């Protein structure tokens, strides 16, 4: 804590000169400044200016405090941005720790002497700073919780500076976060799992999705081991003591959470090439498990071209490895060039496999490959917009695997997912977009709501504005933000520009509210009378209502008040029975609302319209009937 002109810092600190990590209280030699082992504590009340002069005379790395010294609470200050990373790591899966040197090129917005970045549980050995093209000079540093503060010995910025950090990190074998190791039989393996904020456990970095930069990775490993990473192998050179140096091609800009590497006695199989650029595809498994990956081999060549065709952009990365990972905490992770899958999901003996399991694997692979555009090529600017990654990948995976199904089953998966999501959403758990202000809140980043309600939002808007115009808008969105970041507002703006439909009120409601509307329909005098009841209360929803009317094309109307009347020509028959034409009020089956028809309308659509509905519309009718009549089932 801070007391007067002196600072008591019960944290790890160092000067950057030699192995100087220190635990325990350290007194600084400047007012609220960083400490140096060579600095001496002064009596309380001594003049700060005199101390700075003394430190300067003695050539000590002691600097006056600035507002840049204030520790971040969660989000990094915006004054520094990484433009390139170089990682040089020595990794032996048999050891519980590894050594690393991280060199980071940084662009500074303004003059400063302090740089903040992320670290967690790293043992910092040395830190040095260099102006571009100059020699490195030792810097003082301090670790505070999940941050590393570096104080330069000279003024830096605005402009570029290089930061080099020499450190050690743990390879945890008790959990599966950060860089960790697992044993299978007699073999040890190292894997990484960084999403959303655990890259900082493996190397110092700007561990936020808005900070994307190229990564050059070099691994020093035992000669009998294999190393893989995001980029293709660039070179492999034998070193002393039974080691070898494996360098990988520098990546395109990536967020830290999708940087990945793995080391161990892997089996690797060439799975051919895929996509417009005929990128190489490989399957990677623990030793002796390749036969259990049979179902995965053909999937990439079949699914990747479908995603390229929709996005209009060739697969953006230089290779595509699918690797089975021991005890991966997620089902799969979309690291560019090195997609990881939980081994129990990815590897199944052909003798025990089932068509259902294969279909689920293909959908998982389609989801992770969709992330190569939605999440990696274009990355959410902050975690409150994680749905731009997960919602899009869920929606895309359903789209590209739909043709794997028999015709009478196509489109049903999204309706089933919508129904399940609405049952959960009725409980008011959380909205799709949730502001992230603490580490604890990031535990909720990958909630099911983000995936399924995010995907349902996209499907509803797609059917409302039209599949063709929506596709044009999505392609434009990807082109505008390629290799960068995006926000929900930017997506909404692009959709509106390319479709001419004002989608923002609809999407904002879907993404920022919990619940959904229950909408009641009845016919009177060739008008469809519509009343909505927000489930969970609140103001009326703004939602498109798409109707399928007998002998007419499907059409959509915007419901933006509690009650509307929609003219429906031909809705009433003038024949002797005076029957209403049948109407189903959730055409396409994608509207995120419960449709409740009055008795006469329901009888008509069940008796005369059911056979004319699409499979998705039939299912949406049935699930809405069940949800309203059996709400607890």
Where are these regions (language model features)?
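Extended, low-hydrophobicity, Ser/Thr/Pro/Gly-biased non-transmembrane segments
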Residues: 105, 164-270, 293, 435, ...
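A surface-exposed beta-strand-loop module
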Residues: 121-184, 241-242, 566-577
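Aromatic/His-enriched, Gly/Pro-containing loop or helix-boundary segments
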Residues: 114, 136-157, 193, 197-200, ...
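Ligand-binding face of N-terminal immunoglobulin V-set domains in extracellular IgSF glycoproteins
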Residues: 98-120
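N-terminal, polar/Ser/Thr-rich
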Residues: 54, 58, 62-99, 185-188, ...
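Hydrophobic alpha-helical and helix-loop surface patches within well-folded domains
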Residues: 3, 146, 248, 277-537
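Non-catalytic accessory/interaction domains
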Residues: 218-221, 244, 287, 370, ...
């Amino acid at each position: 804590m801070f007391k007067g002109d002196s600072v008591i810092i019960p944290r790890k600190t160092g000067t950057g000169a030699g192995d100087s990590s220190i635990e325990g209280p350290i007194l600084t030699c400047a007012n609220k400044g960083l400490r140096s082992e060579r600095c001496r504590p002064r009596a309380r009340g001594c003049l700060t200016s005199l101390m700075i002069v003394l430190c300067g005379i003695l050539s000590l790395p002691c600097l006056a405090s600035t507002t840049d010294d204030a520790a971040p609470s969660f989000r990094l200050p915006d004054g520094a941005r990484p433009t390139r990373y170089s990682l040089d790591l020595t990794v032996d899966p048999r050891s519980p720790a590894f050594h690393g040197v991280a060199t980071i090129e940084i662009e500074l917005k303004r003059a400063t002497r302090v740089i903040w970045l992320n670290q967690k549980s790293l043992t910092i050995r040395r830190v040095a700073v260099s102006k571009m093209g100059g020699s490195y000079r030792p810097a003082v540093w301090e670790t505070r919780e999940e941050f590393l503060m570096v104080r330069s010995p000279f003024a830096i910025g605005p402009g570029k500076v290089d930061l080099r950090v020499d450190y050690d990190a743990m390879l945890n074998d008790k959990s599966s976060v950060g860089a960790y190791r697992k044993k299978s039989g007699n073999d040890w393996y190292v894997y990484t799992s960084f999403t959303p904020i655990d890259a900082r456990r493996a190397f110092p970095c700007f561990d936020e999705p808005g900070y994307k930069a190229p990564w050059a990775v070099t691994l020093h490993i035992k000669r009998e081991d294999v190393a893989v990473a995001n980029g293709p192998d660039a070179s492999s050179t034998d070193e002393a003591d039974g080691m070898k140096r494996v360098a990988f091609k520098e990546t395109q800009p990536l967020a830290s959470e999708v940087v990945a590497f793995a080391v161990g006695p892997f089996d690797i199989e060439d799975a051919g090439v895929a996509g417009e650029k005929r990128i190489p595809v490989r399957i990677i498994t623990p030793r002796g498990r390749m036969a259990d990956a049979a179902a995965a081999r053909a999937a990439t060549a079949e699914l990747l071209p479908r995603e390229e065709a929709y996005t209009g952009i060739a697969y953006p990365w230089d290779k595509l490895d699918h690797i089975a990972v021991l005890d991966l905490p997620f089902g799969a992770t979309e690291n560019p060039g090195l997609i990881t899958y939980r081994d129990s999901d990815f590897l199944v003996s052909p003798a025990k496999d089932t068509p259902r399991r294969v279909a689920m694997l293909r959908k998982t692979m389609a989801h992770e490959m969709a992330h190569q555009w939605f999440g990696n090529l274009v990355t959410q600017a902050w975690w409150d917009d994680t749905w731009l990654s997960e919602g899009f990948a869920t929606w895309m995976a359903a789209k590209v695997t739909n043709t794997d199904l028999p015709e009478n089953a196509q489109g049903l998966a999204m309706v089933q997912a919508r129904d399940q999501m609405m049952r959960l959403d009725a409980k008011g758990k959380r909205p799709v977009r949730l502001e992230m202000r603490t580490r604890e809140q990031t535990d909720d980043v990958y909630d099911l709501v983000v995936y399924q309600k995010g995907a349902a939002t996209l499907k509803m808007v797609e059917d409302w504005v039209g599949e063709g115009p929506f596709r044009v808008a999505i392609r434009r969105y990807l082109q505008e933000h390629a290799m960068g970041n995006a926000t929900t507002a930017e997506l909404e703006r692009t959709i509106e520009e390319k479709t001419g439909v004002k989608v923002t009120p609809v999407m904002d409601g879907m993404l920022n509210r919990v619940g959904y509307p229950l909408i009641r329909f009845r016919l009177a005098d060739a008008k469809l009378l519509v009343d909505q009841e927000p489930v969970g209360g609140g103001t009326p929803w703004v939602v498109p209502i798409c109707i399928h009317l007998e002998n007419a094309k499907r059409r959509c109307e915007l419901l933006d008040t509690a009650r509307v009347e929609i003219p429906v020509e031909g809705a009433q028959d003038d024949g002797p029975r005076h029957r209403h034409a049948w109407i189903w009020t959730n055409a396409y089956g994608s509207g995120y609302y419960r449709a409740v028809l009055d008795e006469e309308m329901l009888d008509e659509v069940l008796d005369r319209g059911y056979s004319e509905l699409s499979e998705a519309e039939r299912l949406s009718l049935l699930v809405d009937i069940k949800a309203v009549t059996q709400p607890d089932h």
